[in-house]
């Protein structure tokens, strides 16, 4: 019964073309629009590439310090001030307890919208940023919007857990958490998933596992160690240190799963 239900599900297509110098989409996937959210952690080396691809750039509070301080090191522009003025976020959102006063003043003078949410201490800065994007994006456009989040992995584990929780809180949106080493995305149980591997920028190591609720049946193709109606839960078996073996990985499950894949040394 479960197998028949899953096979009839709509297919959700995923790819990491946003990591490439030039965007392209799988033939059967509609064109994606990207939004970039920068958190207050060291910038991954490929942030300038993401910045170029994104139509909307939001800094979460102290993420503005990172753009102000670190983008110059990632570009070939010898003019420090020119680099700063070229990378201006459309919005800076958060409780404003981390952004430095001179950084806030600079971006405000360059036209960035400063959205002070210091009155709201119930949610994280990332939650505030994603809430804004979710609120401002019509429902029919959400499936073709992909939100890229840098600085979401690494540092304190409770911060990482809160960031992963965002994937579940906003499961109707495509959100990708990124670090220099890997990415994480949610594969909702409501869909069958096709993941197109960009082997020049990602892989081969990958993982697939449920968080919060167990999976009673997960089936994959395209991996070195495929799953066939496998049960997964913490305290038992989960798929880690797996290897992608094909250009396309497929996943079907009765539970929401996290997909993670290693990133190559991008410059």
From Swiss-Prot:
Transmembrane segments: none annotated. It catalyses: thiamine + ATP = thiamine diphosphate + AMP + H(+). GO terms for cellular component: cytosol. Gene3D superfamilies: Thiamin pyrophosphokinase, catalytic domain (3.40.50.10240), Thiamin pyrophosphokinase, thiamin-binding domain (2.60.120.320). Pathway: Cofactor biosynthesis; thiamine diphosphate biosynthesis; thiamine diphosphate from thiamine: step 1/1. It is found in: Cytoplasm, Cytosol. GO terms for biological process: thiamine diphosphate biosynthetic process; thiamine metabolic process. The keyword Amino-acid biosynthesis does not apply. CDD domains: TPK (cd07995). Keywords: ATP-binding, Cytoplasm, Kinase, Nucleotide-binding, Transferase. GO terms for molecular function: ATP binding; kinase activity; thiamine binding; thiamine diphosphokinase activity. The keyword Cytoplasm applies. Belongs to the thiamine pyrophosphokinase family. Catalyzes the phosphorylation of thiamine to thiamine pyrophosphate (TPP). TPP is an active cofactor for enzymes involved in glycolysis and energy production. Plant leaves require high levels of TPP for photosynthesis and carbohydrate metabolism. This is Thiamine pyrophosphokinase 2.
């Amino acid at each position: 019964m479960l197998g028949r239900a899953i096979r009839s599900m709509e297919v959700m297509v995923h790819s990491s073309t946003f990591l490439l110098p030039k965007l392209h989409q799988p033939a059967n996937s509609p064109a994606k629009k990207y939004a970039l959210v920068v958190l207050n952690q060291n910038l991954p080396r490929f942030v300038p590439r993401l910045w170029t691809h994104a139509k909307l750039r939001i800094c979460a509070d102290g993420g503005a310090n990172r753009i102000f301080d670190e983008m110059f090191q990632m570009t070939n522009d010898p003019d420090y001030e020119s680099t700063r003025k070229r990378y201006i976020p459309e919005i800076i959102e958060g409780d404003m307890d981390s952004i430095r006063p001179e950084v806030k003043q600079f971006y405000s003078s360059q036209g960035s919208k400063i959205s002070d949410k210091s009155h709201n201490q119930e949610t994280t800065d990332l939650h505030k940023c994603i809430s804004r994007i979710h609120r401002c994006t019509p429902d029919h456009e959400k499936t073709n919007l992909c939100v890229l989040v840098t600085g979401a992995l690494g540092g304190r584990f409770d911060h990482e857990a809160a960031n992963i929780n965002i994937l579940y809180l906003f499961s109707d949106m495509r959100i990708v958490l990124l670090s220099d080493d890997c990415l994480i995305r949610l594969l909702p149980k409501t869909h069958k998933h096709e993941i197109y591997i960009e082997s020049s920028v990602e892989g081969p190591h990958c993982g697939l596992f449920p968080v919060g609720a167990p999976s009673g049946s997960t089936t994959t193709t395209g991996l070195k160690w495929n799953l066939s109606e496998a049960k997964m839960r913490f305290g038992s078996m989960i798929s880690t240190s797996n290897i992608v073996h094909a250009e396309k990985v497929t996943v079907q499950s009765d539970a929401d799963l996290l997909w993670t894949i290693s990133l190559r040394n991008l410059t």
